[in-house]
Structures are given as structure tokens and as C-alpha cells.
Amino acid sequence: MSSYISLLKPRVIWLLILASVAGYIYGGGGVDSRLFSLLAVAFLSTGGSAAFNHYWERDIDALMTRTFKRPLPSGLITPNAALAYSLALSATGISLGFLLLGLLPGLFVLLGWLFYAVVYTIVLKRRTWLNIFGGGFAGNAVFLGGYALAKGTVDLPAVLISFAIYLWIPSHIWALAFKYRGDYKRAGVPMLPALIKEERAVAVISAINAAAAAYILWLYLQFGGGAGGALVALGVAATIATSIYAAVKKTEEAMWKMYKASSPILALFLIALILSRL
């Protein structure tokens, strides 16, 4: 059972589920039956797409020290079982998205699945370093789906807020990929840190990381408010400080500190948005 749970990538999808909840609460929703329906749909659809990613990438996972112990390369789950599991979860989540949430939220559920499972995993990841920019729209979709459920529509503030997720993803993934760039080279996956010189990679990733933090701060000043501002300030300060530190030091240790210190900023921002509406 634990192997099947790990296929869902719980350490990843919880943030996407939080984004859908933040979208719903920020859009005017409350703690009601629709919220619980949204939680179920978000869990099934994001978990299903994560499990499909495990299935599709089982060959490259076997070549990487970070992933070779995952259930498929280690033989704990067969490819056919993983595929059936992922498609069952995905189909259930997407179907319930339309049935329980409605047409527009259901459409965002479908788009989120397609951007991650198809655009990122199948089409782009092994072909171009731009893969992360295609898959990143899955993050926009989960927030917008929750917002559309509450509001009945999507407006400019919602779109702008959703891009906080989109901008956070590249620096977060690339900072992790920087540490394991040897793995990506060995597996033939064109992640940016595995393609360019280390110093240039550090400069690019730390700059994007700081820019994402500045954008999150601007968003909260424009559209947030209340006690949650302290959470945002904490996340922004930690992210910008460690980004500058990484840019100056240009070492793997400094990059890892930046990765660890800046990882919580998106969750803090989403929680602050929720608090601003409670």
C-alpha cells in the first residue's frame, strides 16, 4: 500500500491541493460541501497525474540516484499496475470535476492534468529545457479551478495570482536539479542546470527565485491583506536573502540552502491568501 501512496507524490501534490483550496476561499467560498468536493477532485486528479508521471518516467528514474528506489524501477509495482492505477485515479478525478464542480472548474481540472501528464511528462521533458514552462501551467490551473468554483468565472486578479505558482516552479525545480545535475546528464534529461555552466546556472536560478519572491510580495500588497502578511514577509525575506547568498557564493551548498529556505514561500503565500478572506 505504501508503494501506491508514494506514486501519488504526496510531498508534491499537497501544495497543488492547497492552491485549489486557496483559490476557492479567496474567490469567496467557505468551509462547505463544495470545498470537500474540491479536495477530493484535486487529490484524485493531481495524484493520478503524478502516478502517470511515475509510469512514463520509469526508465529514466532507474538511471538517477535520486529516483532509482521509486516503486517502478525497484520492482515493487509493475508498469501495467501503475498505469491502470494512474488512469483510474485520473479518470475519476476529472469526471468528478465536471460532475461535482461544474463545467468551468472541471475544465481547469482537465487542463491541469493535461499540462502535467501530457505537455510536460510526455511531450516536453525529454526534448527541451523549456519543459518546465509548459508543465508549469498545471499550477495555474489548480488555483483557477478553485477560484472558478467559488466565483463562477475567472478574472484578472485570479490570473495574476495564479502566476505566482507558475513563476515559483522553475526556480524550485531547477534548484533541485542543480544538486542532481549529474543524474539528469546521465539520464539524458535536458534540465537547464545540466546544460549550462554551473556559474551561469546559479545566476539564472537565483535571479528567477528572487524575482518570483518579489512578484509574490507585489501580489499580496495588491490583492491580500490582514495578519497573513507576516507569513508572506517571512517567506519573501528568506527567499531573497538566500538567493543573493547563492548568487554571491556560487556553490552547491549555497544553492541547496536557497532551495530549502525558499521552498515554503508559495505555501505561506497561499495560506496568507486564505487568511485574508476568513
UniProtKB/Swiss-Prot annotation:
Membrane topology reported for the UniProt record: Multi-pass membrane protein
Q: Where are the transmembrane segments?
A: 12-32, 35-55, 76-96, 98-118, 129-149, 158-178, 199-221, 226-248, 255-275
Q: In which pathway does it act?
A: Porphyrin-containing compound metabolism; heme O biosynthesis; heme O from protoheme: step 1/1
One annotated Gene Ontology cellular component of this protein: plasma membrane
- Spell out the Pfam families in the cross-references: UbiA (PF01040)
Enzymatic reactions: heme b + (2E,6E)-farnesyl diphosphate + H2O = Fe(II)-heme o + diphosphate
| GO biological-process terms attached to the record | heme biosynthetic process; heme O biosynthetic process
Question: Do you know which CDD domains this protein is assigned to?
Answer: PT_UbiA_Cox10
UniProt-annotated location(s): Cell membrane
Q: Which UniProt keywords apply?
A: Cell membrane, Heme biosynthesis, Membrane, Transferase, Transmembrane, Transmembrane helix
The record's function comment reads: Converts heme B (protoheme IX) to heme O by substitution of the vinyl group on carbon 2 of heme B porphyrin ring with a hydroxyethyl farnesyl side group.
| Miscellaneous notes | Carbon 2 of the heme B porphyrin ring is defined according to the Fischer nomenclature.
Which family does the entry's similarity section mention? Belongs to the UbiA prenyltransferase family. Protoheme IX farnesyltransferase subfamily.
Q: Which NCBIfam families match?
A: cyoE_ctaB (TIGR01473)
Protein name in UniProt: Protoheme IX farnesyltransferase 1
Instruction: Tell me the organism.
Output: Pyrobaculum aerophilum (strain ATCC 51768 / DSM 7523 / JCM 9630 / CIP 104966 / NBRC 100827 / IM2)
